[in-house]
């Protein structure tokens, strides 16, 4: 009986101990007067109250907090081991007399007292992170993956173990956290992470970019203290909420995200609102390869299939092409001539452009003569919303480095998919080419290529957009049959000088004239592209000395202004001075004013350049453009005469 009672007493005592087990903050206060002690204790109590309950329960230890005068002048505090935190004594007087509560620091937290509170929470997070307070499930997975890596090596390690073997921290080496924070997997490195964080824009504190440990601690400050954190960094807010099973109250968040449309129509307002609820599906948009330096592996993009306002989400949204947007990682080169060496060494910034689908279709199918394939990704509603949200975050915050080989459009898009969609099969994808990424998505049943099985149906439903090359060749075949033109390929015909094509016009019947008009328009687009390249080379050749070529004295300045002013379309963060993360409603008005003003200036500059640019071209190029335009005018008039003679309707 005594043994049974003793056992019950021990069990009761053990249960009582576990019920009260929690973090204890103890003020180590030698030499403090009562007022200093009281102010310090209030700070400690407030910090403890701000922490998530699970945080306090798991970090079951006593941590001493002391004031010291040997900390760096620019530092407010520092964790000194697992059971001690030091605060900078220079702030003690302000905390004691209450002036710290009103003294502004110029940082997001505002006052000196809030900064002290944030510092204490920051350092406590470091202690928590180093304590390896994993859940039982995490512990089992880490042990399993560590054993497998020790036995099989990194190369043979299963995909679901990437980043799990040998983990040392509670949060800061969690693969999911690293994806969200901006330290993604390196392409082809079996889970190794990038050394640098490219999310450098609109950061609340650049210290977070030092390493993942500081990122976790800095963001814990804002998670606990900033009610707008859930709206500014929603994915990270949800991450902390899931880790602790708790979250502080937050502001009401807008349902849509601001973005800047980088379309080339300077007459349109670029600022738009992207509502994830209107996104029906997301497609992997692939531009086929060609022989150009930067296009020989194809180009990877994502297409947002957005429903027209008022239309319920469904297959009919695929017909709302004017609403669809394209997410495209591109090397931002200031619109100058591409350098293969700079592309290999990462000299170009890599940014996420948001473009209208119509422009992308024209750019690839009509100008570059490349087909587009649009393959739906198999995502549920939550994943679609998460991916759109992550794209918006990247649009405002990411400014990476573009490498043609190791960090190109395919790699950047894969990083976006991994961070935006928390699905295990994505973590083991490894490819540096657009076709390679697509093949892996298909193999893992994440993409549906069956939509391309029927070519005609794919064209009708917008899963494929054919290159105009085949259409041009078909038009040229009409000329071959009716006019017996000696060239065999449309490319050979378009390569002829415009004046050599002109004599054939008078012999053309109605159908041949229509074909000639289409081909002359294609030739003009080609000439404009060549003229653009010529201007790039001219500008680049005199970049350091614009006065070295008299042609650049006037138009060159306009050209430079356009390059300078259009940069905001790929780096929208430069329009906002304050805040961090996703822009909030209070910042939208400023964005509207800034974008409207810059877009109007770009339109004026573009009109000026249109008038001045011909003077910059070589005489031969200028003559070819003028001859091409004259051809279009002549064949158009000839076509109208034939139409009239055939009894066709003539509009006034």
Write out the residue ranges for each language-model feature:
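Activation targets extended, charge/polar-rich intrinsically disordered C-terminal tails
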Residues: 99-105, 130, 135-208, 218, ...
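Glycine-rich catalytic cores of cysteine/serine-nucleophile enzymes that process amide/ester linkages
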Residues: 80-119, 278-369, 403, 611-621
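Active-site-adjacent bridging/hinge elements
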Residues: 187-197, 272-279, 294-295, 299, ...
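Active-site recognition of the HExxH zinc-binding catalytic motif
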Residues: 114-132, 217
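Bacterial N-terminal signal peptides
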Residues: 6-16
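Second-shell loop/turn segments in exported
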Residues: 29-38, 103-115, 202-207, 287-291, ...
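N-terminal regions that are enriched for targeting/export leaders
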Residues: 241-289, 297-299, 312
């Amino acid at each position: 009986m005594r043994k049974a009672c003793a056992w019950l007493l021990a069990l009761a005592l053990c249960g009582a101990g576990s019920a009260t087990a929690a973090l204890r903050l103890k003020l180590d206060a030698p030499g403090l007067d009562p007022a200093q002690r009281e102010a310090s204790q209030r700070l400690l109590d407030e910090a403890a109250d701000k922490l998530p309950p699970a945080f306090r329960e798991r970090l079951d230890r006593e941590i001493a907090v002391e004031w010291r005068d040997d900390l760096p002048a620019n530092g407010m505090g520092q964790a000194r081991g697992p059971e001690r935190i030091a605060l900078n004594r220079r702030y003690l007087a302000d905390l004691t007399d209450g002036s710290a509560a009103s003294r502004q620091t110029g940082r997001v937290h505002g006052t000196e007292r809030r900064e002290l509170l944030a510092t204490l929470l920051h350092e406590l997070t470091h202690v928590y992170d180093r304590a390896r307070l994993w859940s039982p499930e995490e512990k089992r997975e880490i042990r399993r993956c560590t054993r497998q890596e020790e036995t099989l090596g990194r190369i043979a390690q299963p995909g679901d173990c990437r980043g799990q073997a040998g983990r040392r921290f509670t949060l800061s080496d969690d693969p999911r956290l690293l994806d969200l924070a901006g330290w993604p997997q390196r392409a082809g490195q079996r889970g190794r992470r990038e050394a640098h964080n490219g999310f450098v824009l609109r950061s609340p504190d650049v210290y977070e970019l030092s390493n993942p440990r500081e990122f976790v601690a800095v963001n814990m400050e804002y998670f606990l203290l900033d009610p707008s954190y859930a709206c500014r960094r929603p994915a990270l807010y949800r991450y902390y909420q899931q880790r602790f099973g708790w979250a502080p109250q937050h502001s009401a968040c807008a349902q849509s995200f601001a973005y800047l449309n980088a379309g080339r129509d300077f007459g349109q307002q670029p600022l738009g609102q992207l509502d994830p609820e209107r996104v029906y599906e997301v497609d992997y948009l692939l531009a086929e390869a060609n022989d150009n330096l930067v296009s020989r592996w194809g180009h990877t993009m994502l297409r947002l299939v957005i429903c027209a306002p008022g239309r319920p989400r469904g297959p009919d949204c695929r017909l709302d092409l004017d609403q669809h947007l394209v997410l495209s990682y591109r090397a931002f080169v200031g619109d100058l001539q591409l350098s293969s060496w700079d592309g290999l060494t990462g000299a170009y910034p890599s940014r996420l452009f948001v473009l209208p689908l119509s422009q992308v279709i024209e750019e690839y199918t009509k100008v570059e003569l490349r087909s587009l394939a649009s393959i739906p990704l198999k995502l549920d509603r939550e994943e679609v919303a998460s991916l759109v949200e992550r794209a918006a975050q990247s649009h405002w915050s990411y400014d990476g480095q573009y490498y043609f080989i190791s960090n190109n459009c395919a790699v950047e898009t894969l990083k976006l998919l991994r961070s935006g969609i928390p699905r295990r099969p994505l973590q083991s994808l490894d490819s540096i080419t657009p076709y390679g990424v697509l093949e892996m998505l298909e193999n893992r049943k994440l993409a549906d290529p069956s939509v391309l099985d029927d070519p005609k149906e794919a064209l009708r439903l917008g899963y494929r957009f054919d290159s105009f090359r085949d259409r041009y060749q078909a038009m040229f075949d009409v000329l071959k049959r009716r006019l017996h033109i000696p060239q065999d390929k449309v490319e050979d015909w378009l390569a002829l000088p415009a004046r050599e094509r002109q004599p054939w016009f008078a012999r053309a019947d109605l159908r041949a004239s229509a074909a000639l008009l289409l081909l002359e328009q294609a030739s003009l687009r080609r000439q404009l592209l060549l003229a653009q390249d010529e201007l790039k080379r001219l500008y680049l050749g005199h970049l350091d000395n614009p006065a070295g070529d008299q042609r650049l004295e006037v138009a060159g300045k306009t050209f430079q202004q356009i390059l300078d002013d259009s940069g905001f379309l790929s780096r929208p963060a430069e329009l906002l001075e304050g805040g961090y993360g996703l822009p909030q409603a209070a910042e939208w008005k400023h964005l509207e004013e800034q974008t409207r003003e810059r877009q109007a200036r770009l339109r004026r500059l573009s009109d000026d350049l249109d008038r001045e640019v011909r003077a910059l071209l070589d005489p031969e190029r200028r003559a070819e453009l003028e001859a091409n335009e004259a051809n279009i005018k002549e064949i158009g008039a000839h076509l109208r005469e034939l139409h009239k003679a055939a009894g066709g309707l003539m509009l006034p």
